[in-house]
Amino acid sequence: MGFCRTFIHKKLMIFSVRKLSYIIYIVITSFFIVKNQFIDIGDETYVNQVRSDEYTKNLAMNLTQNCANDKTCEVQAMLDFVTAIPYKINESVARSSKQVVTQNFGDCDDKSNLLISLLKAKGYEAYFVLVPEHIFVIVSLPTKLNTNALYVNDKRFYILESTAKGSKIGFPLRYKMDEIKAIIDPFSNKKLVINKLEYK
């Protein structure tokens, strides 16, 4: 019986150490996840909910499966899906991709987080653009389209408006250049350094 008690005691100690290690891992991981969701923009703080999970990757693959690697087709297919989700103001912070899809509603934060997560899953260079009381997505495409684009440091990006149902790539810029508060990479949680900004 002495051996049995000692063995059980050792097992409990191993279990406790493993459990403690797991809790520490969760706390540290959660800290970095939360830290990477917040970014300060002047006097304001923006919270993102971008995702690079299997759900988002599979959704992006399904939405673009008929595009035969046509980049314009892929981006438009993902944009069509997001804009078809009903617009409804979300009083809390932005929700995850899966929540927006399953609950079937979202505001500009929610829908932009979903859209940029889908674009990221397919390997596109895309950013958030923060303007007064709104956020939209810009994406880089290899093909020059017959529409205006936002040139960031001389690189061409097309505006994607997630809240306008049926909108197309290259949505018109409806803000003055000095109203653009920041252009953000939400996956690295960094603001782009902008030396030159043009819309043409």
Predicted regions located by residue number:
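A structural boundary/capping signal
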Residues: 1-200
